[in-house]
């Protein structure tokens, strides 16, 4: 599945370079027109990130997301500093279909385990952002400001017994760079964890990247910058993914 992504600050579409808030690009794009176009073209899911909420929970863009969700019929998954059940309930009550949990899955594993039981594996997506160090897939947290000694494999193995199903995996070195995805990484983790539905994120810049990612076995690809900068059209991306 092709999943277009929009990162939002104060209701505006932005892209961070390698997760850096001080190195960002603002896009003069009408989000509502874009969503309407995507709905007509057959997009099945949208990925939204609340960058304000990720920095400070008091700055959540609740009105923005309420407006978006009431406007479009495309199912929404959302992330950005989700740290408690109040956040999850608030987003689900707005109409969000899936919530993306990042740092909490590392810092508060017991709590996230409980969420998987309460809400079910089809609602919770774990976002595992990794840095490759000495062939280890080390997880970074808190907007990639802090690296851990915990590997992606350890986290998936920890949550799998209670039904973990969805993982969004980003190679930080690729995010927002248009330098091509890390196909070796995705091929490896898909082979290791056949029960997980992986979403790949980072580095896609051309249609060839989508074809190569599909061959790795990932179920979905999140695309941000390359669609925002018209490297290819949504029609081309959807056709490309379906054609293989």
UniProtKB/Swiss-Prot annotation:
Keywords: Amino-acid biosynthesis, Cytoplasm, Histidine biosynthesis, Isomerase
CDD domains: HisA
Keyword Repeat: no
SUPFAM superfamilies found in the cross-reference section: Ribulose-phoshate binding barrel
Gene Ontology CC annotations of this record: cytoplasm
Catalytic reactions of this protein: 1-(5-phospho-beta-D-ribosyl)-5-[(5-phospho-beta-D-ribosylamino)methylideneamino]imidazole-4-carboxamide = 5-[(5-phospho-1-deoxy-D-ribulos-1-ylimino)methylamino]-1-(5-phospho-beta-D-ribosyl)imidazole-4-carboxamide
Catalytic center residues: 7 (proton acceptor), 129 (proton donor)
Primary localization: cytoplasm
Subcellular location: Cytoplasm
Protein's pathway: Amino-acid biosynthesis; L-histidine biosynthesis; L-histidine from 5-phospho-alpha-D-ribose 1-diphosphate: step 4/9
Protein name: 1-(5-phosphoribosyl)-5-[(5-phosphoribosylamino)methylideneamino] imidazole-4-carboxamide isomerase
Organism encoding this protein: Buchnera aphidicola subsp. Schizaphis graminum (strain Sg)
Gene behind this protein: hisA
């Amino acid at each position: 599945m092709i999943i277009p992504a929009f990162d939002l600050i104060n209701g505006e579409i932005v892209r961070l370079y390698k997760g850096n808030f001080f190195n960002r690009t603002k896009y003069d794009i009408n989000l509502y027109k874009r969503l309407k176009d995507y709905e007509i073209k057959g997009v099945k899911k949208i990925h939204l990130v609340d960058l304000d909420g990720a920095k400070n929970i008091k700055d959540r863009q609740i009105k923005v997301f309420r407006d978006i969700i009431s406007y479009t019929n495309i199912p929404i998954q959302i992330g950005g500093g989700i740290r408690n059940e109040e956040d999850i309930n608030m987003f689900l009550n707005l109409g969000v279909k899936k919530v993306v949990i990042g740092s909490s899955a590392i810092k508060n594993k017991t709590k996230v385990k409980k969420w998987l039981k309460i809400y079910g594996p089809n609602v919770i997506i774990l976002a595992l952002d990794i840095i490759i160090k000495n062939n280890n897939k080390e997880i970074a947290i808190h907007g990639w400001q802090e690296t851990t000694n915990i590997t992606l494999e350890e986290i998936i193995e920890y949550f799998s017994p209670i039904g973990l199903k969805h993982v969004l995996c980003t190679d930080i070195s690729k995010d927002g760079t248009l330098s091509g995805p890390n196909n070796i990484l995705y091929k490896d983790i898909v082979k290791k964890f056949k029960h997980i539905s992986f979403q790949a994120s980072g580095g896609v810049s051309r249609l060839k990247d989508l074809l190569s990612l599909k061959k790795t076995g990932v179920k979905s690809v999140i695309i941000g910058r390359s669609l925002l900068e018209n490297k290819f059209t949504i029609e081309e991306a959807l056709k490309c993914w379906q054609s293989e």
